[in-house]
Amino acid sequence: MRPSLVRLVRPRRPERKTSPILPPLKLYKALLRAHANKLPVELRPLGDQYVKAEFKAHKNIDNPLHIVGFLAQWQDYLKGIDGGEWINGKLSQQDLEKMSPEQIGQLHELMEEAKKAGASE
């Protein structure tokens, strides 16, 4: 039996399993839009301030690996917000092990601010 023409044709390049990374400005605007549409009103200012501060802090980074990692992580966060996964989201031990001490400190500060916001209700 001869193979069909469809089986002989191969794709020109492999398919991506992940979506391409959004440009920084589009990602930034999409994050703020997602906060406006998906987050509860009391959490929106906290989320917006954090996104703005992080993008401002990483504005002058020159290392392409850091840029790609930064944008990829924020894009994953955006998918979580859009999908509603943020409500029950948990950080795995593997993710914690990958973090630098500075990042763990930032995470702790974020946790404390979230607790303050929750206690003020």
From Swiss-Prot:
Q: Where is the transit peptide?
A: 1-35
* Location in or out of the cell: Mitochondrion matrix
- Main subcellular location of this protein, as a coarse class: mitochondrion
- Keywords on record: Chaperone, Gluconeogenesis, Mitochondrion, Transit peptide
Q: Which GO terms describe its biological process?
A: carbon utilization; gluconeogenesis; mitochondrial respiratory chain complex II assembly; regulation of gluconeogenesis; succinate metabolic process
Looking at the keywords, is Transit peptide present? yes
InterPro entries according to UniProt: SDHAF3/Sdh7
Please provide, in alphabetical order, the Gene Ontology terms of the cellular component aspect for this entry: mitochondrial intermembrane space; mitochondrial matrix
What top-level branch of life does the organism fall under? Eukaryota
Q: What is known about its subunit structure?
A: Interacts with the iron-sulfur protein subunit within the SDH catalytic dimer.
The record's family statement is:
Belongs to the complex I LYR family. SDHAF3 subfamily.
What the entry lists under PANTHER family is as follows: DC11 ACN9 HOMOLOG, SUCCINATE DEHYDROGENASE ASSEMBLY FACTOR 3, MITOCHONDRIAL
Its biological purpose is as follows: Plays an essential role in the assembly of succinate dehydrogenase (SDH), an enzyme complex (also referred to as respiratory complex II) that is a component of both the tricarboxylic acid (TCA) cycle and the mitochondrial electron transport chain, and which couples the oxidation of succinate to fumarate with the reduction of ubiquinone (coenzyme Q) to ubiquinol. Promotes maturation of the iron-sulfur protein subunit of the SDH catalytic dimer, protecting it from the deleterious effects of oxidants. May act together with SDHAF1.
State the name under which the record lists this protein.
Succinate dehydrogenase assembly factor 3, mitochondrial
